[in-house]
Swiss-Prot record:
Domain of life: Bacteria
Name of protein: UPF0178 protein Ping_0754
Family per similarity comment: Belongs to the UPF0178 family.
InterPro entries: UPF0178
Listed NCBIfam families: PRK00124.1
Source species: Psychromonas ingrahamii (strain DSM 17664 / CCUG 51855 / 37)
Pfam families, alphabetized: DUF188
Length: 151
């Protein structure tokens, strides 16, 4: 059981929570990014720096994550690949990607991207605040408890 973190766009508070939870539960963590990450050296914590390029980190995670792992990502196309493989995917706001919601999220992402390119909308996601941190912490704890029961 490993937690894979799509670390380039992962908020620092989420990375910190994952590090604490991984240490507390002796869970392997792999932070994947295309730039160096300030991640402390600890047992069961690995950083993988992939080459620069579009979706290189995503492809690495998709190729290496397996059933019973958790992937933390904001990247909806990566989440769709992960869910299709039967692997659990969670975003930094604490929302699980599932077979029931991933198609809708992908469609909304594509629509937003299209509207942004046409100048119809601007901006990005809402502020990442205390509520989002708490939602993520709760979702991560639920997954860890469930995962520990099945191993």
């Amino acid at each position: 059981m490993t937690i894979w973190i799509d670390a380039d766009a992962c908020p620092v508070p989420v990375r910190e929570m994952v590090l604490r939870a991984g240490q507390r539960t002796a869970t392997a963590l792999v932070f994947v990014a295309n730039s160096p990450l300030p991640v402390p050296r600890r047992a069961l914590v690995k950083t993988v720096q992939v080459a620069q390029g579009f979706d290189v980190a995503d492809n690495y995670i998709s190729q290496h994550a397996v059933i019973n792992d958790l992937v933390i990502t904001q990247d909806i196309p990566l989440a769709a690949e992960i869910v299709e493989k039967g692997i659990t995917a969670l975003n930094p706001r604490g929302e699980l990607y599932t077979e029931a919601n991933i198609r809708q999220r992908l469609a909304m992402r594509n629509l937003s991207e299209e509207l942004r390119s046409m100048g119809q909308i601007s901006g990005g996601p809402n502020k990442f605040g205390d509520k989002e941190k708490q939602n993520f912490a709760n979702a991560l704890d639920r997954w860890l408890q469930k995962a520990k029961k099945t191993t």
